[in-house]
Amino acid sequence: MYLVVTRSFPPELGGMQNLMWGLTNSISKYNLTKVFADYQEKHKEIDDSVSFSIERIGGAKLIRKYRKAYLVNEFIKKNKKIECIIADHWKSLELIKSKKKKICLIH
């Protein structure tokens, strides 16, 4: 299983959002994939059309950061088959407590 932790994911528009979307779509064709992404308006249409699981985290930016890290850390504890954690930025990995292999796309 691959875990994607990102602040940049559709339906929000942008280059990093497109990169994370394309990367996640490609990975999900070969591996079970779970995404933790920031809440975006009108996300339901996209989330319902993909073959991987997307968990959206909302709230104020500072609270969202800690809440997302907590949810990711809990998910990692419960799922021992995670092979790799992929993040869009070092800030997305900052509070993740795991010795699993990590890939960070710094932009």
Regions found by a protein language model. Name each.
Residues 70-81:
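Short, well-structured alpha-helical segments in soluble
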Residues 82, 99-102:
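A short helix->loop->beta-strand "cap" motif at the edges of active sites that frequently abuts
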Residues 87-92, 106:
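Short His-centered aromatic/hydrophobic patch
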Residues 14-15, 45, 94-98:
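Short glycine-/acidic-enriched loop or helix-start segments at secondary-structure transitions
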Residues 63, 93-94:
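Short glycine-rich, flexible loops that bind phosphorylated cofactors or substrates
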Residues 6-13, 20-64:
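N-terminal strand-loop element at the rim of the active site
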Residues 1-3:
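Extreme N-terminal starter segment of soluble prokaryotic enzymes
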